[in-house]
Amino acid sequence: MAKQVLILPGDGIGPEIVAQARNVLDVVNNKFSLGLTFTEGLVGGAAIDTTGVPFPEETLATAEAADAILLGAVGGPKWDKLDMAIRPEKGLLGLRSGLELFANLRPAILYPQLAEASSLRPEVVAGLDILIVRELTGGIYFGKPRGVRTLENGEREGFNTYVYSESEIRRIGRVAFEAAQKRNKRLCSVDKANVLEVTVLWREVMDELAKEYPDVELSHMYVDNAAMQLVRAPKQFDVIVTGNMFGDILSDEAAMLTGSIGMLPSASLNAAGKGMYEPCHGSAPDIAGQNMANPLATILSAAMMLRYSLAAEDAAAAIEQAVSDVLDQGLRTRDIAGSSGESVSTQAMGEAVARVLADR
């Protein structure tokens, strides 16, 4: 049976990097006889410009019918003055909530070819391989009430609600424990249980879950210490599980340990295994249309999509090996060029990966 993939190029550099990932997918689709079909849709600023809203009903319907979604990026200064309710980022949040994509998997892997690109000394980051499991649909980003109000004295006050239910914590915990079982069996739960009651419950539920996974070593760490430890000794971590806001911050920090956020993919999954896959970086409007963005995170996101949602492990592994081979050849986009300064374009990098795949 054919598998349907929804392609959402989005904003900024999104269309450029997604185009290269699509070319790579076309190669493996033919090479491995995957039977994939592709549909494109609108989300974010591109959707606002066309339909007036960041997340059209048509996009949601197409996403619900698809087996997997590949997203470029959303947002940009063009839409910054819009009301919060209709900014491009609401399209991304709408996808996550509409498809119940509650689990975000963000690997932070340092390719040995890029050790010099890391902001830390090579001996600190050599062999780095961390997986951050972030809860996506709860916490302060979605809690209500929220808003800005005017007090009786005329002063404005902004407010948000930070809330997690036991069931939300438990389901993301299971994803993290099961991921740890398939890796080095170490899980660090990150919270702020010394201050926030929400994360007191978080810690209690993680401790309860640990009894069901006796082969996994569970530890706890406050988020401020975790941020410090990621810089001081990042290789102490195997799998990290945390809430929405903390995960948003820590995963970007971990990304920079690898040399460039342009190298890192991510997966957002629901309970049925349907996923949305996207690079960890943003829309980078400052370089949009200049053919200099790094497409590798998006290409690697496509590999994750093949692995987690489309049951095509061989094709996923082939893409990942092709990326490594291209790095071995010395090809670098500007963000990972290092001290040499020699770089190739978005298109050249994407074509190199596709060529390696086709020739193998």
Curated annotation (Swiss-Prot):
Location in or out of the cell: Cytoplasm
Pathway: Amino-acid biosynthesis; L-leucine biosynthesis; L-leucine from 3-methyl-2-oxobutanoate: step 3/4
SUPFAM superfamilies according to UniProt: Isocitrate/Isopropylmalate dehydrogenase-like
Catalysed reaction equations from the record: (2R,3S)-3-isopropylmalate + NAD(+) = 4-methyl-2-oxopentanoate + CO2 + NADH
InterPro entries on file: IsoCit/isopropylmalate_DH_CS (IPR019818), IsoPropMal-DH-like_dom (IPR024084), Isopropylmalate_DH (IPR004429)
Gene3D superfamilies in the cross-refs: Isopropylmalate Dehydrogenase (3.40.718.10)
Cofactor note: Binds 1 Mg(2+) or Mn(2+) ion per subunit.
UniProt keyword list: Amino-acid biosynthesis, Branched-chain amino acid biosynthesis, Cytoplasm, Leucine biosynthesis, Magnesium, Manganese, Metal-binding, NAD, Oxidoreductase
Residue numbers marked as site, Important for catalysis: 141, 192
Binding-site list for NAD(+): 76-89, 282-294
Cofactor list: Mg(2+); Mn(2+)
GO BP term, pick one: L-leucine biosynthetic process
Main localization (coarse): cytoplasm
Ligand binding (substrate): 96, 106, 134, 224
Gene Ontology terms: cellular component: cytosol
E.C. number(s) listed in UniProt: 1.1.1.85
Oligomeric and partner information: Homodimer.
UniProt-listed NCBIfam families: leuB (TIGR00169)
Family to which this protein belongs: Belongs to the isocitrate and isopropylmalate dehydrogenases family. LeuB type 1 subfamily.
The protein, known as: 3-isopropylmalate dehydrogenase
Species this protein is from: Hahella chejuensis (strain KCTC 2396)
